[in-house]
Amino acid sequence: MKSNDKVIIGRLARPYGLRGWIKVVSFTHPIDNLLNHPTWQIQHNNEWQPLKLQAGKLHEPFLVVKLENIDDPETAKHYTNDLIAIERGALGALKEGDYYWTDLIGLAVVNTHGIELGTVDSLIETGSNDVLVVRSKERERLIPYTSYTIQSIDLEKKIIVVEWDADF
């Protein structure tokens, strides 16, 4: 889902209206953060192509956007389900110990006893703390993303060590 130079930030959904607007499913928080990026990379027919954002607005739970050279619903329909990415360099620098969710997805999760629990499939925002959705062949685990639970994250080794009982 990600490459070294691009970060997936959303997906084009379906046409909206008669003038080429498109509904967007945002993977950012808040969802309208996508609108801060004037040029998007769209994965259309398995190739990345730049498209300029002409306008956008919040239409919860979606965004609706107008992209350059997409002026009618028939053209917009061809972009349904295309992924939206931005260049990784367009993301702000993070403080030590902070991570973008996209960088955690796919990492192996191991507890402090060395037992492999699975890989990070996604994250959930709950209000009190974020939660790692960790999947293995046997099951799915919901592990709180807290300073107590998360012992270490090593992006180079692609591993997260957690204080978590293998039976939970």
UniProtKB/Swiss-Prot annotation:
Domain PRC barrel: 95-168
Gene3D superfamilies in the cross-refs: PRC-barrel domain, RimM
Statement: the UniProt record of this protein carries the keyword Chaperone: yes
GO cellular component terms attached to this protein's record: cytoplasm; ribosome
Origin: domain of life: Bacteria
Keywords: Chaperone, Cytoplasm, Ribosome biogenesis, rRNA processing
Record HAMAP family: Ribosome_mat_RimM (MF_00014)
Protein known as: Ribosome maturation factor RimM
